[in-house]
Every structure is written in structure tokens, then in C-alpha cells.
Amino acid sequence: MSDVLSQYKGCSVRDLPTPNFVINEEKFDKNCTTMLNNVEKLSQECGVPIKFRAHVKTHKTAKGTLKQLGHGLPLAKRTTRAILVSTLKEAEELLNYQDRQCSDYIDDITYSLPCCVPEFIPLLSNLSRRVNNFQVFVDNIEHLENLKNFGRPASGKKWSVFIKVDMGTKRAGLAFDSPEFLSLLKKLTSSEIKEVIEPYGFYAHAGHSYSSTSINDTQNLLMEEVKAVNSAAKVLCSVDPQFDPSKLTLSVGATPTSNSLKLDNKSTLVKFITTQLVSTLEIHCGNYCMYDLQQVATGCVQDHELSGFVLGTVLSSYPSRGELLSNTGVMCLTREASSIKGFGICADLEHVLKSESFSREWYVARVSQEHGILRPIRNWNETTPLKLGSKIAVLPQHACITMGQFPYYFVVNSEGIVNDVWLPFQKW
């Protein structure tokens, strides 16, 4: 990436090739700072330690991860050393980067896919040697059997496991009040399993919070997450009365539910944490550093808070049908959607770089492989025309998926000047 940076450093965003992905570093920094400070404020209001674990899956970069951890953010009131990864490659490459920098800003990694099967356990074992704290997900009795049969990981410690709690999305995990969950905990507390495995805590993710339409809705869902993991911990204590629940970490969050921490009135949450929570609370989330239209649709953030966009070019015009052609097709925008229509909202480059509201006039209505068809949000005759050859910023529906389509990201300041290029640790 040094060649790309040397070629484009100092250039204006208007001079960059398209399509490409651009990150506004000042907005990225502000988003990271805000989330860290919201968690810190909750901790102070409750008078108890509350952890934060940054999910790095959206951008998958070393420099972006450092910011999520609180480094280089002068206004951040806390830092963290704990991350969540969606692939083993993310973890390995971040640790490789850390080794090259002779630093240890990460010392706690959780792998978020329940994959304790023979194919992956040796890989998980090797990774356990490289970090002080490493957790894996389990949601199946066979996962426990597989770990037991493998034996302790290469770290020499016991396997540290998060039990995944299903919040009703039926993606992964078990409902805390299900017979399967009870059976899993009975197996977890059996003497043969205890020799090689220990519970780290319970993990819940309200994926359905992405369908929320107000921040008050997401606050209610955050309460549901907290209550679910707390109930899960109580089930464990009922199975093993000798177990001390204060040793557990109860990890909850999604970007929409975590964003509800910005609300001034958190009295119900604070009261529950201070009077009923049996273990240490941890907040986790990842998309917040970037944001996207799916997050805007939840009512928790504004479009000018998005820190990234796809840079495209207007290629042709079809006034008779009221459409334009751009090079922002499915290969760079994907087919993700939300309650906001289309596959992306177009914005003027001057406006999208500022931290203030801007008007929406065009959106990406249809996509094929390399073709993006733009339509006006209102009437063609009432919309500011876009000249052929002009550059546009397209706000993506889902940043995590969209960013996966690009080999690197141009990082610009609020004036649109390139100051860095970030390389993502993509694929597997």
C-alpha cells in the first residue's frame, strides 16, 4: 500500500480513481471517541467497572482498530485492549502488525463464530498462544466434547468459552430458557469438561435491533440483552451452586443497542446493573466507527455521521427516463438494503465531508455488475442535475459488506485531502 499512498497522498478526493472507498478520519475518530465515552459514562453512573470490546469486522484494519481501542483519540476518556474478530485472519494479522510495532495494545481476543469442530480447533489453539486472553464461542454440547477430546490449547491454559445466547434472531446461540441451554450448562459443569474448559461468560447480540426505528426502541432491546445474559448466568449458578458468578463477563451489544447509551435517561438500566446484575457487564459493537444507512434507518444516528462512502463517477444521462448512470454497481455497493430505499444515497463531496446535515437528491435505484442506475428522490425537473464526469459520494446501506469489496481505503481529512491508505485484512 506504500505505492498507493505515495501516489495519492496530498491529493484531493476529487482526483482519486473510481470506484473506491473513502474514510473521513475525523468522523471515524469522533465515532470511536463517542462510543468509548458513552461506555465510560455508564460505568461512572453505575459506580462499577463496565468493559468495552471493539468488534473490528467492519473495516478490518490495524490503524482503525487502534482508534477503536482509544489510541490517538485525545478526547477519549478510556481505552480498551479487548477486541472481537469475525475471522481468524483478522486476529492473526492484527497480532502480526502488533509484533512489527513492538507493542501490545491488544491482549484480549474473542472469536465470534461458534466453530469448535475438528477443522478449526488446532487453529484456535495456535492463536491462544499469542494473546493473554482468548475466548471461543460455544452453543452446542458437541463443541464441548470436541474441545475436551483435543485437550488444553497451546497456551497451556483451559479453553475459555463464551456461551452464545440467542436473542430470538435464530442465527447462532441458544435461548437461555431452552432445554438445550440447560443441557449445555450441565455438560459444561461436569468434572470431565472442567479439566480443560472454563466459562468466561455469556454473550448476546440483538441483531433484530437493526430493524428498530427509534433510539428508545434500541434502549429497550439493550435491556433485553442485559436481562438475557444475567438470566443465563443465574441458570449456570442453579446448575452449579458452587460457581461464583462474579467471575463471569456478561457481554451485550449491537451498534443500535449500544448507541442508546447516548441517552441521558438510563435510570432503568443503571438500576438493573447496580441492583440485579450478578456479573461484570461488557458492551460490544463494531459498525459504530463507520455507520451506514442501515444505522440511519434505526433512528440512532444521522446521515452526516457516516464516516465512509463509495466514491463514484457519473457516466451517462437519460432524461427521457429520468435516470443517470454511474460506475457504482453491485460489485462495490452489494445488494444490501434497509427501510431507506435503494442501494445507496448520493451526496455532494463538499457536503458529505462536513459534520452537518445535507440534502438527499439522488439515490442508487438499481445495480448490475458495474452499472449503478441513479434516480432522483423527488421529481427530475426539481433535482439539481449531475454533470457527466462529476464525482459523487454514495453512502452505503451496509458498511461492513460494502468495504469488503475494496482492497484498500483512502483516508481523508475534512477538506477531502488524502493523508493515509488503510489496508484491510480481508477474506479468511
Swiss-Prot record:
Q: How is its activity regulated?
A: Sodium cyanoborohydride, N-ethylmaleimide, hydroxylamine, phenyhydrazin and EDTA are inhibitors of the catalytic activity.
Q: Where does Zn(2+) bind?
A: H398, C400
What pH-dependence text does the entry carry? Optimum pH is 8.0.
Chemical reaction(s) catalysed: D-serine = pyruvate + NH4(+)
Pfam families reported in the protein's UniProt record: Ala_racemase_N, D-ser_dehydrat
**What are the names of the required cofactors?**
pyridoxal 5'-phosphate; Zn(2+)
- The EC number(s) given in the record are 4.3.1.18
Biological process terms from the Gene Ontology for this record are: D-serine catabolic process; D-serine metabolic process; response to toxic substance
Instruction: Give the modified residues of type N6-(pyridoxal phosphate)lysine.
Output: K57
Keyword Amino-acid biosynthesis listed? The answer is: no
Q: Which InterPro entries match?
A: Ala_racemase_N, D-amino_acid_metab_enzyme, D-ser_dehydrat-like_dom, D-ser_dehydrat-like_sf, PLP-binding_barrel
Q: Which UniProt keywords apply?
A: Detoxification, Lyase, Metal-binding, Pyridoxal phosphate, Zinc
Its domain of life reads Eukaryota
Residues binding pyridoxal 5'-phosphate: Y203, Y210, T255, G286, N287
Q: Which SMART domains match?
A: D-ser_dehydrat (SM01119)
Q: Which GO terms describe its molecular function?
A: D-serine ammonia-lyase activity; metal ion binding
Q: Does the keyword Zinc apply?
A: yes
Name the Gene3D superfamilies on file: Alanine racemase, D-serine dehydratase-like domain
Q: Which PANTHER family match?
A: D-SERINE DEHYDRATASE, ZGC:162816-RELATED
Family that this chain belongs to: Belongs to the DSD1 family.
Subunit structure as annotated in this protein's UniProt entry = Homodimer.
What does this chain do? Catalyzes the conversion of D-serine to pyruvate and ammonia. May play a role in D-serine detoxification.
What name does the UniProt record give this protein?
D-serine dehydratase
What gene does this protein come from? DSD1
